[in-house]
Swiss-Prot record:
Disulfide bonds: none annotated. This is Ribosome-recycling factor. SUPFAM superfamilies: Ribosome recycling factor, RRF (SSF55194). GO terms for molecular function: ribosomal large subunit binding. It comes from the Bacteria.
């Protein structure tokens, strides 16, 4: 019973960390990377479809992405979707493909992206702490039902706290790395 609670908490904390990593891929650094366009949705036969399902996104050079639509007639829709995505990109349509130049990040935009990264990290920390709280309340319920002793509950609570500390430290490392990437010129 205790092991199941700890394993569930660990799994959920790992998912929070993965979610943070995924959120970080959406935050632009100065370098071109296909995952920046991961959230772009393109209208395709009446339904919004992820860009990756209607076009191939590759890195042409360190500051340029190349987008090739699987169907040539979709290029205009892909262009419009990228422009309206709120990412601040203005693709160049070359007829068969789109080129997206990554504008150099100004100090102001770097600070804004750093703030976004910190906010995402704080959300992940809160999620990890909520998972800890849920696990501790499950342990307390087991004590109330006399399924485990208070000593077992205390030991399990210490283990859950160690898990929490480990994942919060991993979140810290991830946000420091992202900040370093953002501030590198």
């Amino acid at each position: 019973m205790i092991n199941e609670i700890k394993k569930d908490a660990q799994t959920r904390m790992q998912k929070s960390l993965e979610s943070l990593t995924h959120a970080f891929t959406r935050i632009r650094t100065g370098k071109a990377h296909p995952s920046i366009l991961g959230g772009v949705m393109v209208p395709y036969y009446g339904a919004d479809t992820p860009l990756s399902q209607v076009a191939n996104v590759t890195v042409k050079d360190s500051r340029t992405l190349q987008v090739v639509a699987f169907e040539r007639n979709m290029l205009a829709a892909v262009d419009k979707a990228i422009q309206s995505s709120g990412l601040g990109f203005n693709p160049t349509n070359l007829g068969e493909l789109l080129l997206i130049s990554m504008p150099a990040l100004t100090e102001e935009t770097r600070k804004g992206f750093t703030k976004q990264a910190r906010d995402a990290a704080e959300d992940a920390r809160v999620a990890v702490r909520n998972i800890r709280r849920d696990a501790l309340s499950q342990l307390k319920d087991l004590v109330k039902e006399k399924e485990i002793s208070e000593d077992e509950e205390r030991r399990a609570a210490d283990d859950v706290q160690k898990l929490t500390d480990k994942f919060v430290a991993e979140i810290e490392v991830a946000v420091k790395q992202k900040e370093a990437d953002l501030m590198a010129v």
